[in-house]
C-alpha cells in the first residue's frame, strides 16, 4: 500500500530577512499540517510546494503527529534553508483513511532518490561548492541528548538518527542522518559503532560534534574532496568570541591585564567603572586571544602588553568569556577561526583606520564606542492604507538613502524605523551604492510588506570608520509578531511592546477554526 504514495522532498532557501512565502496551517476537521497561500515567485513555489500539501518531515524529523506550534518552531529555527518532506492532499487523506504508517512511508523512496541525485552545475558550468561541516554543542537534559547512533550497511562511519523533536540535539542544530566526523575534537570517521558510543558515553553531560549533513557528504563524495575542519560553520555554538574595539581615554583604557594562574594566556581584570573598556563591552576574566588581528596565544604577559601599546589610542581585542573558552577548548578549535568564518561580519580584527565621515550627513561628534550601540536593525513593514509611513531621502551627489518623517503609529514606526536611519538592504539586497530612484523602486515593488536592514547614523559612522561591512547577521533576528495577512489590521497586545519587539519575520493568526503561520 505504501508504495502507491509518493512524498516529495522540497528544499527551500531564502535570504536573510525574507520569508519562505507560504502559510503553514491546521484546519478544523482536517488532518495534518497544511501548506497554504503560496506566494508567486517565492522560495516555496520554486521548491515545488503545492497548496494542500501535508508536511511529513522537517529536516528529516517526522512531525505529522507533533503539535502545530512545535512544527512552526522547527521551520523558524532552520534559518535560511529548510527541507520539507510533503505529501499531496489527496494522497495524504487516502493514506490516513487506509491507516498507512506515514513515518515509514518515505524511507525506501528517499534512499532511492538520494542515490539517483547528481550535483548540478553552477554558474558558467562550474561545479557548485560543497556546504560546510558544522559544530554542534549539546548539553544533556535529564539522561538524554535526544538522538541515537546508527551505522548504515555499505557505508563507512556512524550517523545520527531518531532526533527527538524539541530535544537537546535538535535545538543544537543536529539533523537526521548527519554523518559524525568528530567527537570533542577527535576524528571518528574510521571508528566503529561501539567506539563512538563509548566516546559519547564518557563525555558526561556535554559533548561537541563536528557533523556533515547527508547532502554535503554526498557532494564531497561525488566531487572527491575531503572535509576541512577549519572551514566548519561555528554559528550554532551558543557562546562566541567577541571583537571589542576600545578607544583610549584620558586615563588609559581602564583595565588590567594579568596572567591567569589556572588559565592559559592573559586575562582581563579590574575593569574601572565608566572606563573605555567597560563602555566597549570588555568583561572581567575575558581571555585575550588576539590584539589588532594578530594572535597572542603564544605570547607572554609583556608581549601582549606591548602589542596593545603599539595600537596607540585605539586597540581591537578578540576575547573569550569562560563559557566560550570552555566550548572552543572542548571542540579543540582555535577561536581565531571565528574571525575567518562568514559568521563574523568584518572577517578580521585588524586595527581600524582613522575615522572618516559617513557618506550621509556628517555628524558633529565622534561615534559612540558602546558596543551595544553598534548594531544594524532588521525591520519588517506591513503596508497600511497603501503606505509604509515614512519618507526616503538622499543627498544629491552622494550614495545612500536614509529615512525621514517617520509617521507616529505608522508601519515604519511600529517596525522600529527611526528618522536618519540609513538603508542598507531592501529584502536582502544591498542598496548602499544604488541610486535613490532604484531604492525607491525596490521598496515600491515589494507589495504589501518589505524587509529593511537599516543602521542608525552613529552606528553607521562607526562601521564606515572601521571599514566593517554591514550585514543582516549583525542585527537581532526578527521575532514573531501580529498577523500580516489576517482579516483585520487592528492593534493587538503586541502593540504595547517596544518597537523592535514588533518587527516581523513570520506572522500568525488563530481562531476557533484554524491556525496558520506565514513562513
From Swiss-Prot:
Biological process terms in GO annotation: in utero embryonic development; positive regulation of protein targeting to membrane; protein localization to plasma membrane; regulation of monoatomic anion transport
UniProt tissue specificity: Expressed in kidney, liver, small intestine. brain, lung, and testis (at protein level).
Region (Disordered): 348-374, 479-519
Phenotype for residue 20 to A: Disrupts interaction of the first PDZ domain with SCARB1. Abolishes interaction with SCARB1
Composition bias type Basic and acidic residues, residue spans: 482-503
Residues modified to Phosphoserine: 108, 148, 192, 250, 334, 348, 489, 492, 508, 510-512, 514
Something else known: Disruption of the gene was not associated with abnormal growth and development or redistribution of interacting proteins. However, a modulation of expression of selective ion channels in the kidney, as well as increased serum cholesterol levels were observed.
Protein name: Na(+)/H(+) exchange regulatory cofactor NHE-RF3
Organism: Mus musculus
Amino acid at each position: 500500500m505504501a508504495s502507491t504514495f509518493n512524498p516529495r522532498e522540497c528544499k527551500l532557501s531564502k535570504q536573510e530577512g525574507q520569508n519562505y512565502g507560504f502559510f503553514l496551517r491546521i484546519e478544523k476537521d482536517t488532518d495534518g499540517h497544511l501548506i497554504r497561500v503560496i506566494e508567486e515567485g517565492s522560495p516555496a513555489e520554486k521548491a515545488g510546494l503545492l497548496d494542500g500539501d501535508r508536511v511529513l518531515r522537517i529536516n528529516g524529523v517526522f512531525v505529522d503527529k507533533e503539535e502545530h506550534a512545535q512544527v512552526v518552531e522547527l521551520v523558524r529555527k532552520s534559518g535560511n534553508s529548510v527541507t520539507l518532506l510533503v505529501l499531496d492532499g489527496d494522497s495524504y487523506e487516502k493514506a490516513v483513511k487506509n491507516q498507512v504508517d506515514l513515518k515509514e512511508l518515505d524511507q525506501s523512496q528517499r534512499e532511492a532518490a538520494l542515490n539517483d541525485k547528481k550535483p548540478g552545475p553552477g554558474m558558467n558550468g562550474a561545479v557548485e561548492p560543497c556546504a560546510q561541516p558544522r559544530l554542534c554543542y549539546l548539553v544533556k537534559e535529564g539522561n538524554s541528548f535526544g538522538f541515537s547512533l546508527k551505522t548504515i550497511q555499505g557505508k563507512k562511519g556512524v550517523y545520527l538518527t531518531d532526533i527527538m523533536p524539541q530535544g537537546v540535539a535538535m535545538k543544537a542544530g543536529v539533523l537526521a542522518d548527519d554523518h559524525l566526523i568528530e567527537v570533542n575534537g577527535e576524528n571518528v570517521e574510521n571508528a566503529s559503532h561501539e567506539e563512538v558510543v563509548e566516546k559519547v558515553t564518557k563525555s558526561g553531560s556535554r559533548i561537541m560534534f563536528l557533523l556533515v549533513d547527508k547532502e554535503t557528504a554526498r557532494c564531497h563524495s561525488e566531487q572527491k574532496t575531503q572535509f576541512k575542519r577549519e572551514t566548519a560553520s561555528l554559528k550554532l555554538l551558543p557562546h562566541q568570541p567577541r571583537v571589542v574595539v576600545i578607544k583610549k581615554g584620558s586615563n588609559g583604557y581602564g583595565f588590567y591585564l594579568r596572567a591567569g594562574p589556572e588559565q592559559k594566556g592573559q586575562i582581563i581584570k579590574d575593569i574601572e567603572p565608566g572606563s573605555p573598556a567597560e563602555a566597549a563591552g570588555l568583561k572581567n576574566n575575558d581571555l585575550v586571544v588576539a590584539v589588532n588581528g594578530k594572535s597572542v596565544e603564544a605570547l607572554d604577559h609583556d608581549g601582549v602588553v606591548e602589542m596593545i601599546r603599539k595600537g596607540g589610542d585605539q586597540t581591537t581585542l578578540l576575547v573569550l568569556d569562560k563559557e566560550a573558552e570552555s566550548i572552543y577548548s572542548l571542540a579543540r578549535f582555535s577561536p581565531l577561526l571565528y574571525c575567518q568564518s562568514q559568521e563574523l561580519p568584518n572577517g578580521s580584527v585588524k586595527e581600524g583606520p582613522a575615522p572618516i565621515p559617513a557618506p550621509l550627513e556628517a555628524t558633529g561628534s565622534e561615534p559612540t564606542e558602546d558596543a551595544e550601540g553598534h548594531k544594524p536593525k532588521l525591520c519588517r513593514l506591513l503596508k497600511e492604507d497603501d503606505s509604509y509611513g515614512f519618507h526616503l531621502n538622499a543627498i544629491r551627489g552622494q550614495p545612500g538613502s536614509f529615512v525621514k518623517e517617520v509617521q507616529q503609529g505608522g508601519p515604519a514606526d511600529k517596525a522600529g524605523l527611526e528618522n536618519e536611519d540609513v538603508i542598507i538592504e531592501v529584502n536582502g539586497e544591498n542598496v548602499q551604492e544604488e541610486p535613490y530612484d532604484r531604492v525607491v523602486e525596490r521598496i515600491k515593488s515589494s507589495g504589501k510588506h518589505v524587509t529593511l536592514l537599516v543602521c542608525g547614523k552613529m552606528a553607521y559612522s562607526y562601521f564606515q570608520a572601521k571599514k566593517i561591512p554591514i550585514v543582516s547577521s549583525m542585527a537581532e533576528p526578527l521575532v514573531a509578531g501580529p498577523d500580516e495577512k489576517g482579516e483585520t489590521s487592528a492593534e493587538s497586545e503586541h502593540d504595547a511592546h517596544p518597537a523592535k519587539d514588533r518587527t516581523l519575520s513570520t506572522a500568525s493568526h488563530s481562531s476557533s477554526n484554524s491556525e496558520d503561520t506565514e513562513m
